Amino acid sequence: MVSLEKNDHLMLARQLPLKSVALILAGGRGTRLKDLTNKRAKPAVHFGGKFRIIDFALSNCINSGIRRMGVITQYQSHTLVQHIQRGWSFFNEEMNEFVDLLPAQQRMKGENWYRGTADAVTQNLDIIRRYKAEYVVILAGDHIYKQDYSHMLIDHVEKGARCTVACMPVPIEEASAFGVMAVDENDKIIEFVEKPANPPSMPNDPSKSLASMGIYVFDADYLYELLEEDDRDENSSHDFGKDLIPKITEAGLAYAHPFPLSCVQSDPDAEPYWRDVGTLEAYWKANLDLASVVPELDMYDRNWPIRTYNESLPPAKFVQDRSGSHGMTLNSLVSGGCVISGSVVVQSVLFSRVRVNSFCNIDSAVLLPEVWVGRSCRLRRCVIDRACVIPEGMVIGENAEEDARRFYRSEEGIVLVTREMLRKLGHKQER
């Protein structure tokens, strides 16, 4: 354990990110989002009115001072690759800044896909080694949060760790979806179990478990050595949570980093914000929260901007229809290029180029880009996928049986509508 003075912290906050490379695991399918990920990887799913989910991990890197990034892709990667090429191509390679796209290399005979999260890094080791980084930050590309990775890097160095795992308490009934750990008084991880059926509780709070967030910092040389050993192990599933972290824990070289120490928040008294929007309800709820009066996630912090591809679009427009009814919204996010004509939009999120025609009522809905809503529609508690054409007079979210017959309806009553579902009902999707 190394004790650092305040000036040392400031120096390390500048230096450590420059000595690091971030690898963002962005190949996940996200099957729990159902048809929303049929044609795009989960990190490429739209979020918050104008962003993609991966923009949060990428923006965290830039804001933390990390300007060398590799995005590891796999499932349905075209949309993700296109987004990064369009929105994240401003780096200066002469200044050693870049975002590298790293698809599956098929280096294992007979293997076309990554065998696990660790194998996704292993297959790109020859490229990653060329970065000559001292530290490697491993990130998931499908979570919504704001974090200063420089604080986690300082914690890693100060504790003398070879591997540091970001963690946060979660309700014990939800902990089976995470890696769960126990730590000593110095935050050394003394036990780690991946997705246990009966998760252990925290000693000071029986209602919570200490969960891994899938965010890791490694000494680079140590990581490369581990990955090569794991690659030779025929009994390994080649996964960080299932194989590598338990092995490092057993060797006594893994430390925990409490997320509140590096979470970026405008309100220091607020609960640290981190969301896995992996289910339809979680995705819908996280989007709608941004439209609330005081959202849990501050998207207006000029000191920690979330960057994305910005298409040149006109401002949103609210107009009256021919009968004189005004287009109006309340507690909603409405992006550029939208036109609301003589309709009411309440507690909803409308992405770019959405058109809502006259006499509609939109309530608690998420409408992805280029959705076209015909006249006299009522949409409630739903997610409408990109470029859907909702026919005149359609009602969604008011009749559970009808919704389940026509579309996908979750157990919580959130309805997902896609172009393919509408086509099967005989509704043309071309305008």
From Swiss-Prot:
Catalytic activity: alpha-D-glucose 1-phosphate + ATP + H(+) = ADP-alpha-D-glucose + diphosphate
Annotated positions for site Could play a key role in the communication between the regulatory and the substrate sites: 74, 113
Alphabetically ordered keywords of this record: Allosteric enzyme, ATP-binding, Carbohydrate metabolism, Glycogen biosynthesis, Glycogen metabolism, Nucleotide-binding, Nucleotidyltransferase, Transferase
UniProt-recorded Gene Ontology molecular function terms: ATP binding; glucose-1-phosphate adenylyltransferase activity
Binding locations of beta-D-fructose 1,6-bisphosphate: 39, 419-423, 429-431
Pfam families given in the database record: Hexapep_GlmU (PF24894), NTP_transferase (PF00483)
Record-given protein name: Glucose-1-phosphate adenylyltransferase
Species the sequence originates in: Escherichia coli O127:H6 (strain E2348/69 / EPEC)
